[in-house]
Structure formats: C-alpha cells, structure tokens
From Swiss-Prot:
It comes from Pelophylax lessonae (Pool frog). It holds the Pfam family Antimicrobial_2. Shows antibacterial activity against representative Gram-negative and Gram-positive bacterial species, and hemolytic activity. GO terms for cellular component: extracellular region. It comes from the Eukaryota. It is found in: Secreted. This is Brevinin-2Ea. Belongs to the frog skin active peptide (FSAP) family. Brevinin subfamily. Disulfide bonds join 27-33.
Amino acid sequence: GILDTLKNLAISAAKGAAQGLVNKASCKLSGQC
C-alpha cells in the first residue's frame, strides 16, 4: 500500500544519503576530492 511505498522511499533516501557521506569521507581520506 501507500505506507509501504513511503517507507521504501524513505529507506532509499536514507541509503542514498549515507552512500553520499561515505563517498565524501573516502575521497577526503584518499585526497582525491
């Protein structure tokens, strides 16, 4: 239903944000930003 769809969207957004933070951190650590 709609609640499941919203929950999945929220999970996807959270995963995307986390991935972005990880990418930013790793590029800073490796000095490749």
